[in-house]
Design a protein with these regions (language model features):
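Catalytic core of soluble alpha/beta enzymes
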Residues: 161-164, 168-302, 330-332, 337-339
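Structured beta-strand/loop patches that form or line metal/cofactor-binding pockets in enzymes
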Residues: 1-40, 45-55, 327-330
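Metal- or metallocofactor-binding catalytic centers and their adjacent structured scaffolds
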Residues: 5, 37-114
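Conserved, mostly hydrophobic/aromatic
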Residues: 3, 34, 41, 70, ...
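Flexible C-terminal active-site loop/helix
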Residues: 4-15, 29-31, 296-365
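Glycine-rich phosphate/pyrophosphate-binding beta-alpha loops
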Residues: 48-57, 135-139, 292-295
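N-terminal small/glycine-rich loop or linker at the start of catalytic domains
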Residues: 113-137
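Gly-rich Lys/Arg/Thr-decorated short loops/hinges at beta-loop-alpha junctions or inter-strand turns
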Residues: 127-132, 151-158
């Protein structure tokens, strides 16, 4: 199966409600979609959102990187030579991790289709279902409590609560949600780099001293402040998870060796696709460090790839935060992964299993 061409498109899925963090507010999933075409008629699907505040990628940069630098290198290549093709993608240009992720996802989709098996089986197999948490966005306390109770009613057993704008208000938010949930769900906090190291320790100790048990706190300090992250990790009981601090396998090794965090959050848009995500999961497994599989505000195309990865690497990926499809007003994909609130199931279709994408607007060649 050889790659003969590619097309790009745009996909927009409005969110049910705005998604608010300490960093940004998002109102819709807006993905660049890549379709890799082959001589056998098979199509590989990949996608990536713009995440300028996190990775630096915009829709324009994603399109330019794929059109001008990445996709042309793949024309005429056999998808069976997956490792070499992924190396071509990664070395096509510096940074641009979202663009690389979109193309790599499409490559892995084609590779598994050529093998005639679902992607997770090609990656090593596993039980084709996982459970995700759901995010409670930063908002007024009453609204966040109502959102938490609504999530419980829809079957979610883990709530990821956005904090990080103001530590005193954060404490009140968590206390209110903790009281309302009353032990019916685990609580995960995500500060999105919003605290200083001392603020993080003070805030978390206040919550811990109040008897509030939290499953983890994610990226409490600035991404580049590894010393600060280690400072927090050493001084609180709640496990600390690194997100924006870990994009690459090398960063994962450094963070683990310095004991700067207890958990690593893997996101395909940070790692530049599946090849580096697999490396990070394997590194974490060697060190006995658990991982979360996470996502940006992105469509079910790329999240499906993350689900396949999580199933195949269940020895190290023990937590999932793949709620973006549940935040959208509709699921644009048909086939592959079935997103049913907290329960994510993979069918037995080859590759990602995507048959059609509703609402996709192809760009002119």
């Amino acid at each position: 199966m050889k790659i003969t061409g590619f097309r790009l498109g745009m996909l927009r899925v409005p969110l049910k409600t705005p998604f608010k963090t300490a960093v940004r507010t998002v109102r819709a999933i807006e993905d660049v979609v890549v379709l890799l075409q082959t001589d056998s008629g098979h199509i590989g699907y990949g996608a990536a959102p713009a995440t300028a505040p996190i990775t630096g990628d915009t829709h324009g940069s994603i399109i330019a990187a794929i059109q001008q630098y990445i996709a042309p290198k793949l024309i005429g290549q056999d998808v069976a030579d997956l490792n070499r093709l992924c190396a071509l993608v990664q070395h096509a240009l510096e940074r641009n991790s979202n663009a690389k992720a979109a193309v790599e996802i499409a490559l892995y989709d084609l590779w598994a289709q050529a093998l005639g098996t679902p992607l997770y089986q090609a990656l090593g197999g596993g039980t084709p279902r996982i459970t995700t948490d759901i995010t409670i966005s930063v908002d007024a306390i009453d609204t966040m409590v109502a959102d938490a109770l609504s999530a419980l009613a829809r079957g979610y057993g883990s709530l990821k609560i956005k904090v990080g704008k103001d530590s005193e208000s954060d404490v009140e938010r968590i206390k209110a949600i903790h009281a309302a949930v009353a032990g019916r769900a685990s609580l995960r906090l995500d500060a999105n780099q919003g605290w200083t190291p001392k603020q993080a320790v003070r805030t978390m100790r206040t919550l811990e001293d109040a008897g509030i048990v939290m499953e983890l706190v994610e990226q409490p300090v600035k991404a580049a402040d590894i010393d600060g992250l280690a400072f927090v990790t050493a001084r609180i009981d709640t496990p600390v998870m690194a997100d924006e601090s870990v994009f690459s396998p090398i960063q994962a090794i450094e963070l683990i060796r310095r004991r700067a965090a207890d958990i690593v959050n893997i996101k395909l848009m940070k790692t530049g696709g599946l090849s580096n995500a697999i490396r990070i999961a394997d590194i974490a497994a060697l060190y006995g460090v658990p991982c979360m599989i996470g996502c940006m505000i992105e469509s079910s195309i790329s999240v499906a790839a993350a689900v396949h990865l999580a199933v195949a690497k269940a020895d190290s990926i023990t937590l999932a935060d793949l709620d973006a499809p549940a935040l959208g007003q509709f699921d644009p994909t048909e086939g592959g992964v079935h997103f049913d609130e907290a329960q994510l199931h993979i069918d037995d279709s080859p590759g990602l299993g995507i048959r059609r994408i509703r609402g996709l607007e192809l760009l002119s060649d």
